Amino acid sequence: MRFDVVTLFPDFFTSPLASGLLGKALAKQIAEVYLLNPRDFTTDKHHRVDDESYGGGVGMVLKPEPIFAAVESLPVLPRREVILMSPQGERLDQALLQSLADNFDQLVVICGHYEGVDERVVDHLVTREISLGDFVLTCGEIPALTLLNGVIRLLPGTVGKAESLQNESFIDGLLDFPHYTRPADFRGWPVPQVLRSGHHAEVDRWRRTQQIQRTRDRRPDLYQRWLNSLPPDSLQDFTV
């Protein structure tokens, strides 16, 4: 899968893309990441990428010309999405990450800055806006890296054991169950006996119960959404 990131700070991505699972995925050519700096696509001697906002106001706006030029310099794969990381976008969640991983061969990711980008970029270049949540960050590189990380780890071959992806938070609409490792007793806090019992059916039942309880207690919004997704005749099977 190909990722093209339009960013004023390409060095921001150097270490994360060389480390951990992302680094391994790139080394195995599961994913390709290309970084484009809009300054390299300017035509003035100062390499200016921003200007004042029409109508006045505080803050600068990213100019359309360098962004269009950067994106238009790229090859176009058959299944391509041009994404702007923006507080105005749809909320990023696991389902959206999975959809991007499954349905596209190329993601062009534009990192916003300052007061944002010229609206003509949104209207005539971007095909989707994505937000991490209802808050504002200093730059678009942080959400862009989050998007890359979330999508790349879903690509076949990135995570060693495919089943690891099937037991994570949000895969089935619920939070993950608690995890424990050795020692069996730490400072008087023992690992639940059921996890040491060797009874796989009991372990699965315990984990499912923990998922439901944890989601209900910590994320009632997710819990209600999960309940609403269940067939009415199955609700009695999930009372905890």
Swiss-Prot record:
The UniProt gene name for this protein comes to trmD
State the family named in the UniProt similarity comment for this chain.
Belongs to the RNA methyltransferase TrmD family.
Positions bound to S-adenosyl-L-methionine: 112, 132-137
- Report the Gene3D superfamilies cross-referenced here: 3.40.1280.10, tRNA(m1g37)methyltransferase, domain 2
Q: Which UniProt keywords apply?
A: Cytoplasm, Methyltransferase, S-adenosyl-L-methionine, Transferase, tRNA processing
EC number(s) reported in the record: 2.1.1.228
Task: Write out the function statement from the record.
Answer: Specifically methylates guanosine-37 in various tRNAs.
Give the principal location in a single coarse category. Answer: cytoplasm
Single Gene Ontology BP annotation: tRNA N1-guanine methylation
Q: Tell where it localizes.
A: Cytoplasm
Reaction equations catalysed: guanosine(37) in tRNA + S-adenosyl-L-methionine = N(1)-methylguanosine(37) in tRNA + S-adenosyl-L-homocysteine + H(+)
PANTHER family from the UniProt entry: TRNA (GUANINE-N(1)-)-METHYLTRANSFERASE
Source organism (scientific name)? Cyanothece sp. (strain PCC 7425 / ATCC 29141)
Question: Can you list the GO cellular component terms from the UniProt entry?
Answer: cytosol
The record's GO molecular-function terms, alphabetically, read:
tRNA (guanine(37)-N1)-methyltransferase activity
For whether the record's keyword set contains S-adenosyl-L-methionine, the answer is yes
Subunit: Homodimer.
Which superkingdom? Bacteria
Q: Which SUPFAM superfamilies match?
A: alpha/beta knot
InterPro entries found in the cross-reference section: Alpha/beta_knot_MTases, tRNA_m1G_MeTrfase_C_sf, tRNA_m1G_MeTrfase_TrmD, tRNA_m1G_MTases_N, tRNA_MeTrfase_TRMD/TRM10
CDD domains in the record: TrmD-like (cd18080)
Name used for this protein in its record: tRNA (guanine-N(1)-)-methyltransferase
Which enzyme class? Answer: transferase
